Amino acid sequence: IEETKSVVPLDWDQRHTLNVNLNVGVPGDWTVGMIFQYGSGQPYTEDPRISQGVRFENGGVKPTFYNVDLRADKTFDFDGFKINTYLLVYNLFDIRNEFGVYTTTGRANVDLNANYYTQSDIIGLNTIPEYVNNPSMYSSPREIRLGLGFGF
């Protein structure tokens, strides 16, 4: 007997993506640029206990995400030398996008299995709430970089 075939969303499938790049300024003097990214949620496989015993591969969808990055540049000329100063801000609005999710909820901060955990189930020195609210399931926080570049 042949198995029933079906189309299954791949782990990286994403229905909607939007990338917008905006730059203004005077090239060689100053520029400011922003990159906006939006993406609908990617699939994950739900826990069959939550989906009434029916398990569909990649049947759940993670939350949407968005991000804004900023770059500002200013160039100075000194006796034939060019000095470029810049500011980079990754995740400008410090958004906590949920990239990893629990299969029981589809969220990064709620695990319905947490009610059944005991302290001996948790590896390390974390409490159960600390274990559930795992920072590695979120996007990186805001990061600010200042820099200098030299040219001849």
Predicted feature residues:
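C-terminal extracellular loops and terminal segments
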Residues: 1-64
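Active-site-flanking ligand-binding surface segments in enzyme catalytic domains
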Residues: 56-82
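Preference for bulky hydrophobic residues occupying beta-strand positions
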Residues: 24, 34-36, 70, 87, ...
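Short structured motifs
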Residues: 5, 55-56, 71, 131-133
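C-terminal beta-signal and adjacent terminal beta-strands/loops
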Residues: 29, 38-49, 75-152
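Membrane-embedded beta-strands of outer-membrane beta-barrel proteins
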Residues: 20, 70-72, 146-148
